[in-house]
Amino acid sequence: MPVFHPRYRREFSHQPARGRPGPHTRSDLLLSGRDWNTLIVGKLSPWIRPDSKVEAVRRNSEAAMLQELNFGAYLGLPAFLLPLTQGENPNLARLLSTHIHTGHHSTMFWMRVPLLAPEDLRDDLIENEPVPVPEDGSGDEKTWIWWHNFRTLCDYNKRIAVALEVGPDLPSNHVIDRWLGEPIKAAILPTSIFLTNKKGFPVLSKMHQRLVFRLLKLEVQFIVWGAHHHPEKEFCSYLQYLEYLSQNRPPPSAYELFAKGYEDYLQSPLQPLMDNLESQTYEVFEKDPIKYSQYQQAIYRCLLDRVPEEEKDTNVQVVMVLGAGRGPLVNATLRASRQASQRVKIYAVEKNPNAVVTLESWQYEEWGSQVTVVSSDMREWSAPEQADLLVSELLGSFADNELSPECLDGAQHCLRAGGVSIPSTYTSFLAPISSSKLYNEVRACREKDRHPEAQFEMPYVVRLHNFHQLAPPQPCFTFHHPHPDPSRDKSQYRQLEFAVEVNTVLHGFAGYFETTLYGDIMLSIRPETHSPGMFSWFPIFFPIKVSVPGGGGSAGGAGLGAGRGSAGGAGLRGRGGAWRGAGLRGADAPSLPTAAAGGARGRARARGLLALRGPAQGVVRVGGDGARLLCPAQPERPLLHHRPVRGRHVTETPPPFLRLGL
């Protein structure tokens, strides 16, 4: 709703219009305070142009804009709609940022941005006329560049969001995908884009319907705008049609139902090797309908392959469940043995003394002598006999980030020659993503007693929702069990390149994994092969400190290191240049404390992974005294030094003139 009449142009410089008597707009007494606070979205007058090149228009627009914004704050409006009609809006960004930082209000500001620029919708009138090359981006991408430039000027303020205006023509799917990674709060649907069905009711085309379904997943609000083009029907028929689409959209999957409320919620990765998990955490994992059925099938297949039919009554397979928790894998093993009509002897090994109480209760009440409960670290336990089969569920969202390779290699001495490990192999995957929501969430994790940028030095487990994946995931690290040399150096390094098809901004990397339990039985959280209905793992997010623009046919690169004292990094090489960083992974690798967060895999502090990030073309050196990020021009002068000091980890930076943009 316009706060002031859209044709009421106020004058703030010249008399007599400047001193015009009477109220400028309607009284706030027309509605109750609650209605103003919950039902009304303010709208800036269309004649206001704070970035006009005419000084008189610009000054008058500045004063009028501040007047309307201040009156909207006085009313307590929940949101205010402002148009974004061009690529250069520095004065608009300055005025809005000043209003946000100096005012005592919580109003959201929705920037009205069209999917396609109006000038790109007109038809060519002259045949064979040369097509002009736009200066501010290609046709499909022009308005996104407007938005990106504006939100960058406003320093990614989380109170500035997008109201996306949908026109009759839609851009390519790649462009729409990129918009869905932006903080869209509303979608504006002009009445002119609605068609008429056989009964005279307004409807949308199939392409527009698919877009509406995708926007509904982001829980955006819809604004119907324009003249009534279906006079035979009431205007509310537009809203009734949108309600019909909302009720008939595809039902959510089991994974989406479980993740409801966790969308884009940052959680610290679990470290079960270091911390003892809580009972509620075990309970959440045990509710997964897919994971343990797959484990049961893998154990069943393994038992059939290892024991001949004529020996099934005499051959007793020794199964060691490493990290038994509260016993779900033990129960899966028992069910598999009954299904295969095989005899098994089970050792349930668990280091958490609290979970051991539950295991002993299971043994006393259900399992009996067939199961032996062992309260010990699997790496330190001296087994009374060697196992035919090792079963574990030590994987994290990035496969090895919960130190599964170190644990299983440390317990391999319990496995006899020719024995089997379930899982037998697992691979981590990495994909570049763009997400203003996640970038702002990470920035908001800052704490006063920590380094001001410590929140960017750790990964987060998160249910990715409001994001745009810039390229398909690529494999990073692969581990096999059992390994011929369990004491090998586990350091690995991978350098990846991603082809990015649209102009975009890199905010970080999403990590996934795939694992082969046995034979062709797999579990996966990689989007292309995700196990249907499985929700034990959310993806992992590696943020970067400074967002990097790029894409539009350029190549993105990522370098990642895994192992004790290894170095790695990630980046995007495009129009924004190259980015370099370092990552340390391993049981002894340093870490920075992370913000506490709840959730299934988010109650522990991240201690296995540290990322140090720096400017373009930086070089990382890792030594006994920590990690240094060096400038190639002056390698003797570190840009950033991270070192352990008396049990803590301190990040030092030189004076600003030496930091080259850090």
Model-derived features with residue positions:
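Class I SAM-binding transferase module
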Residues: 1-291, 297, 304-318, 322, ...
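Conserved SAM/SAH-binding loop
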Residues: 326
